């Protein structure tokens, strides 16, 4: 966070984490919750590009693993297409962290040899999967 000029952050970032941001940083809130997007994903991508083009060191702060239903792939694809370097420092997805925190194994050689993580949300304009 010390090296960032601007922090673009989501709704899932706790107040405790936000309190670690040093003074003098620009903050841009782009939080989304299911059914309520204060900023659409396409606009978030454009904000990332705008700040990078302005020569700023941008920190995109997301909860969990940005590549597990976090739209991280869309964001880095946008940056890569324009030739901007990026670094991913993933957190732990809640699909793994919550059961572990509760002492519930996700796999166990006597009971479960695999697990699946499936979103319950369809892309806008598409139907939810009936198989869920």
Regions found by a protein language model. Name each.
Residues 1-7, 111, 127:
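Short intrinsically disordered, low-complexity coil segments enriched in acidic
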Residues 2-92, 97:
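Class I S-adenosyl-L-methionine
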Residues 77, 86-87, 93-132:
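Beta-strand/loop-alpha-helix module characteristic of Rossmann-like adenine-cofactor folds
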């Amino acid at each position: 966070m010390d090296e960032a000029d601007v922090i673009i952050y989501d709704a899932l970032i706790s107040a405790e984490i936000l309190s670690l941001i040093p003074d003098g940083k620009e903050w841009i809130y782009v939080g989304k919750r299911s059914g309520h997007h204060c900023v659409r994903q396409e606009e978030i991508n454009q904000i990332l590009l705008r700040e990078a083009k302005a020569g700023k060191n941008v920190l995109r702060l997301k909860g969990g693993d940005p590549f597990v239903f976090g739209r991280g792939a869309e964001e880095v694809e946008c940056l890569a297409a324009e030739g901007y370097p990026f670094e991913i420092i993933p957190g732990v997805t809640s699909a793994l962290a919550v059961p572990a925190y509760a002492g519930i194994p996700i796999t166990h050689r006597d009971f479960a040899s695999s697990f699946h993580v499936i979103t319950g949300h369809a892309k806008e304009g598409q139907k939810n999967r009936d198989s869920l």
